[in-house]
Amino acid sequence: MRRVLAMLVAGLALAPPASAAERSLLVNGDSLAEGTKPYIPRELPSWRVMQSAAVSRHAYQGDEVMRRYGSRLPRVVHVSLGTNDDPGDLDGFRDAIADVMRVAGRSRCVVWANIVRPPYRGVSYRGYNRVLADEASRRANLRVLNWVRMVRRHPEWLADDGAHVSARGYQARAEALARSVRRCE
């Protein structure tokens, strides 16, 4: 009996704390998420990081990506979507955010980066960023990563297309994301 008790106590001592077991992140995004792929795991070494990034992924595809994880969907989700969508369709973007948040549920933290890119068909992405900020103000578990402010402070990061950035820019984005993700704990 003592031997069993000793083994049980030893096993408990070796088990990670509950909070460490819950440190998991899904990155759900487009080409900007592709750019941060090598940096995020380095910034969150004690986290289990899963990444689903695809060039040209649209915001309306975000919820389906998350559904594929089912019960394995991490407690924290980073969304990098909207850059490939029509900024004139504010209702569509709001619906995409609502769909992602519905899949996330109230117990998960979602960190969504706002959008930097030139206007599309003469329409700015400021409207999308306002919609995202508005949705975040109404949802305790939705946080905005202020990518717009970061790029405004470091325009030298921007590539010629006005949407993608240099390696230093992706590194800085991953660093900022890691800070936001840690606040979800």
Could you describe each region identified by the protein language model?
Residues 1-5:
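Bacterial N-terminal signal peptides that target proteins for export
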Residues 6-15:
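Bacterial N-terminal signal peptides
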Residues 16-21:
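Sec/Tat signal peptide C-region and signal peptidase I cleavage site
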Residues 22-99, 119-127:
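Conserved SGNH/GDSL esterase-like catalytic core that processes O-acyl groups on lipids
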Residues 28-30, 113, 145:
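Active-site flanking residues adjacent to catalytic metal/cofactor-binding acidic residues
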Residues 80, 113-114:
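Alpha/beta-hydrolase-fold catalytic nucleophile elbow
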Residues 105-109:
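A short helix->loop->beta-strand "cap" motif at the edges of active sites that frequently abuts
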Residues 118-185:
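Catalytic His-Asp segment of secreted/periplasmic serine-dependent ester chemistry enzymes
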